[in-house]
């Protein structure tokens, strides 16, 4: 069957938990979770670097708790599947170096006592905590999937999660932890997905694997499985270009193949390039860092806008100044998809009325002082159908509609 005519093609990618950058994200967030368990008020900024045979953990921390970082690092590496130098890393024998200092007192002072609280003494309790840095954060939602995520990144993540699942459960033998997925969807003139055009999977494997056998296995147990599981058969009726390990063999992977670094997969972590990004990474940061907490809040806002039926797509931006509680900017864009009779400015005013975007309020409303972050380190922070994440709640739809005078 021929494919429908495409107006444009859009591509997103994901990576597995064995990708070197994702190893680093997982280690950083595992350390963060352990510190929040020991002391929920911990201030954490932990970066990880992995390369052949060694893990470097660096950063700044303020906490009353104690965690055994090398033990956490090794446990996470083994959990991912790096148990032998043959597969690119051995979590049991690799070197682990730790160089963590104390959080800057000047930064701590600005977060503990905001500019508003340092004023004339007239301030609300949620004005007390200042933003941990300046910056801009975006959130996005669209009604093209049930989870209100862009379809390309949603499917790329499903493929990456399934690739890891078939490896760990032995459904497809001879796979190793490192891997990447990429999907290209065609969109029609109305900006709706019309068909799945291309799927790319690159996966690390044992030396004895035959490439033709591997393609058959991954088509059946990963690609076809995800298409059925996601209910995408109607978008996969034509010929799909499938590329499995298009560079050839992929035996050497993990940190032995490429060095990894925390925070280097920020588009994978968010919306797959379908929305703008403020540039700040998430992993290894406690929620006083608005790079993380405000980006989560913006996803919460955008998802509630779309779930409330106010627009088909929504992108929201917030901006902060370090040491100041109140945002310095808020912007709503619906790409001409707002409900008839509504403007972006009206929706923005409703958002300001319904959502308190001061850091202390975000942390309280989303209950962020909990060890919930390691589970987000791979396969995306948003639209996770396998996790119960507070920023995915659609619990403000009624209040948004009420603020706009809608029933």
From Swiss-Prot:
Binding site for Mg(2+): 21
Localization terms from the record: Cytoplasm
Required cofactor(s): Mg(2+); K(+)
Keywords assigned by UniProt, alphabetized: ATP-binding, Cytoplasm, Magnesium, Metal-binding, Nucleotide-binding, One-carbon metabolism, Potassium, Transferase
InterPro entries assigned to the protein according to its UniProt record, in alphabetical order: ADOMET_SYNTHASE_CS, S-AdoMet_synt_C, S-AdoMet_synt_central, S-AdoMet_synt_N, S-AdoMet_synthetase, S-AdoMet_synthetase_sfam
Keyword Zinc-finger carried by entry: no
SUPFAM superfamilies from the UniProt entry: S-adenosylmethionine synthetase
Superkingdom field: Bacteria
E.C. code: 2.5.1.6
GO cellular component, one term: cytoplasm
Cofactor-binding details, from the entry: Binds 2 divalent ions per subunit. Binds 1 potassium ion per subunit.
Binding-site positions, L-methionine: 60, 103, 258, 289
Quaternary state and interactors: Homotetramer; dimer of dimers.
Name recorded for this polypeptide: S-adenosylmethionine synthase
Organism expressing this protein natively: Corynebacterium efficiens (strain DSM 44549 / YS-314 / AJ 12310 / JCM 11189 / NBRC 100395)
Encoding gene (name): metK
């Amino acid at each position: 069957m021929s494919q429908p005519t495409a107006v444009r093609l859009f591509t997103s990618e994901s990576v597995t938990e064995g990708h070197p950058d994702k190893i680093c994200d997982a280690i950083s967030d595992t350390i963060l979770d352990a510190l929040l368990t020991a002391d929920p008020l911990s201030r954490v900024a932990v970066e990880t670097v992995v390369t052949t045979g060694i893990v470097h953990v660096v950063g700044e921390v303020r906490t009353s708790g104690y965690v055994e970082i090398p033990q956490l690092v090794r446990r996470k590496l083994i959990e991912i599947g790096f148990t032998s130098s043959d597969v690119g890393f051995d979590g049991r024998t690799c070197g682990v170096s730790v160089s963590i200092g104390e959080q800057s007192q000047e930064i701590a002072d600005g977060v503990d006592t905001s500019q508003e609280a340092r004023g004339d003494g007239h301030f609300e309790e949620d004005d007390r905590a200042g933003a941990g840095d300046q910056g801009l954060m975006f959130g996005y939602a669209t009604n093209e999937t049930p989870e209100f995520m862009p379809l390309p990144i949603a499917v790329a993540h499903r493929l990456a999660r399934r690739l890891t699942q078939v490896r760990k459960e032995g459904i497809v033998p001879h796979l190793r932890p490192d891997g990447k997925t990429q999907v290209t969807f065609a969109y029609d003139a109305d900006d709706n997905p019309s068909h799945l055009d291309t799927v790319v999977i690159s996966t690390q494997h044992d030396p004895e694997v035959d490439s033709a056998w591997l393609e058959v296995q991954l088509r059946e147990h990963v690609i076809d499985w995800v298409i059925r599981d996601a209910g995408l058969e109607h978008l996969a009726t034509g010929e799909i270009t499938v590329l499995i390990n298009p560079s050839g063999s992929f035996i050497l992977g993990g940190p032995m193949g490429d060095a990894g670094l925390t925070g280097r997969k920020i588009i994978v972590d968010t919306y797959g390039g379908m929305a703008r990004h403020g540039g700040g990474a998430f992993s290894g940061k406690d929620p006083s860092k608005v790079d993380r907490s405000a980006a989560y809040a913006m996803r919460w806002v955008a998802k509630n806008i779309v779930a409330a039926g106010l627009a088909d797509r929504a992108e929201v931006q917030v901006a902060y100044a370090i040491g100041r509680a109140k945002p310095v900017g808020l912007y709503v864009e619906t790409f001409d998809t707002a409900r008839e009779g509504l403007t972006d400015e009206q929706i923005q005013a409703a958002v300001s009325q319904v959502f308190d975007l001061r850091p202390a309020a975000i942390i309280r409303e989303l209950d962020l002082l909990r060890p919930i972050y390691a589970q987000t380190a791979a396969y995306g922070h948003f639209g996770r159908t396998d996790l119960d994440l507070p920023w995915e709640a659609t619990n403000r739809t009624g209040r948004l509609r009420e603020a706009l005078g809608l029933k």
